[in-house]
Amino acid sequence: MSEELSAIDRSILELVQRNADISTGEIAEAVGLSQSPCWRRLQRLKDEGYIKRQVALIDRQKLGESFFIFASLKMVTLTPQERADFMRKIEAIPEILECYTLFGEMDVMIKVYSQSMNWFQNFVFNVLMKLPGVQDIQSTVTISELKYTTAIPVR
């Protein structure tokens, strides 16, 4: 990070994370700049890593019935090599959308995209329980989505 984010930079980040298709002209108009300085700011935000990448958000309901399951994993103590192996395997499983390490009774929390309870049961026994160091799994099945956003507050 080469400099502190200005109010204009923050506004640009708010706009592009809500709509990655927004044009530089639309951003410039919204933040009160001409297109060239706006484009330079946008490039700097990308170059400095504030904007990691631009993606399309898929409506999962259009793909058929699905739901998310949050699974907490209790782990045995792993060596650094085993921990690295665990992370490589987690990263290679496309149905695991997010993974976090935790403080508390459980050690890892994952968010899993599931098509059915039967699929998830097989996933637990054939995939999760075979990961290095997994001792126990507690799962929470979602029944509805009240709020979903990928936008983070940039105040």
Give, region by region, the residue ranges found by the protein language model.
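A compositional/biophysical signature of low hydrophobicity enriched in polar/charged and small residues
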Residues: 1-155
